[in-house]
From Swiss-Prot:
GO terms for cellular component: plasma membrane-derived thylakoid lumen. PANTHER family: CYTOCHROME C6, CHLOROPLASTIC (PTHR34688:SF2). It is found in: Cellular thylakoid lumen. This is Cytochrome c6. InterPro entries: Cyt_c-like_dom, Cyt_c-like_dom_sf, Cyt_C6, Cyt_C_IC. The gene is petJ. Pfam families: Cytochrome_CBB3 (PF13442). NCBIfam families: Cytc6PetJCyano (NF045930). Residues 1-25 form the signal peptide. Heme c binds at C39, C42, H43, M83. It comes from the Bacteria.
Amino acid sequence: MKKIFSLVLLGIALFTFAFSSPALAADSVNGAKIFSANCASCHAGGKNLVQAQKTLKKADLEKYGMYSAEAIIAQVTNGKNAMPAFKGRLKPEQIEDVAAYVLGKADADWK
């Protein structure tokens, strides 16, 4: 019985680790610095100067399917429409940090 319990706990731990979000390990403080240097010219305060309806506010991120670290990472990495790709300009870890920062600010309504 003890062996089964241990195996179940191990399975839960492995499952949790395997499917954890990359934003959990990201550094939102570093993300704030990177955002300020690379993103704030168009997205200051969570706004969008190019497409005003597509802000970085939580409701808009949810509406447009962007309220996840994975979606933000893909957008920042590859760009889309008027937004440039940052794949060659930022390291993957830096992009993860930006995603963590954006999600944190969206949850706090950019205050």
